[in-house]
């Protein structure tokens, strides 16, 4: 049984990780442990580079805390221009898989608050009255009326990040 360390305690992210590992390895073939680690970036990362750095740093910190694990998974959401998205980073042994999620265009009223230094989740809570949005369906769930959720979008990106561990072509040396 694989020991998967999720570098988060966010239930929406842990659910997405669980769904992806179910799809790739099968239910009951792993156990997920969520741990709280620092991303090394601001609470609301801006730009793809800062967001990806946050996901990588989460994995690095999780590896230091749980070196005996088989997989370490970092998920970091960010804002770039007028879009929200997330980076997924998964490490196993010496390999790494990465993927960027689909992006959602944000309305100007939300972006205004983000430019003033607020987090997307706080802006969404203020505008909708829904508390702790980022631990639920996220902005994606609200704006798509539940047709997509933070979990469903992250699930898809996590499946892509797992590809290098399950396709032998990725493990062949370059010639």
Swiss-Prot record:
Q: Which reactions does this protein catalyse?
A: XTP + H2O = XDP + phosphate + H(+); ITP + H2O = IDP + phosphate + H(+)
Q: What class of enzyme is it?
A: hydrolase
Keyword Hydrolase among record annotations: yes
Ligand binding (Mg(2+)): 38, 68
Cofactors that this protein relies on: Mg(2+); Mn(2+)
Among InterPro entries, the record links this protein to: ITPase-like_fam, Non_canon_purine_NTPase, NTPase/PRRC1, YjjX_NTPase
A Gene Ontology molecular function term for this protein is: metal ion binding
Binding-site list for substrate: 8-13, 68-69
What domain of life does the UniProt record list for this protein's source?
A: Bacteria
Q: Which GO terms describe its biological process?
A: nucleotide metabolic process; thiamine metabolic process
Per UniProt, the cofactor note for this protein states: Binds 1 divalent metal cation per subunit; can use either Mg(2+) or Mn(2+).
Report keywords, A-Z.
Hydrolase, Magnesium, Manganese, Metal-binding, Nucleotide metabolism, Nucleotide-binding
**Per its UniProt record, what SUPFAM superfamilies does this chain match?**
ITPase-like (SSF52972)
Q: What is its EC number?
A: 3.6.1.73
Biological role: Phosphatase that hydrolyzes non-canonical purine nucleotides such as XTP and ITP to their respective diphosphate derivatives. Probably excludes non-canonical purines from DNA/RNA precursor pool, thus preventing their incorporation into DNA/RNA and avoiding chromosomal lesions.
Q: Which family does it belong to?
A: Belongs to the YjjX NTPase family.
Quaternary state and partners of this protein?
Homodimer.
Q: Which PANTHER family is this protein grouped with?
A: NON-CANONICAL PURINE NTP PHOSPHATASE_PRRC1 DOMAIN-CONTAINING PROTEIN (PTHR34699:SF2), PTHR34699
Protein name, UniProt field:
Inosine/xanthosine triphosphatase
The species is Yersinia enterocolitica serotype O:8 / biotype 1B (strain NCTC 13174 / 8081)
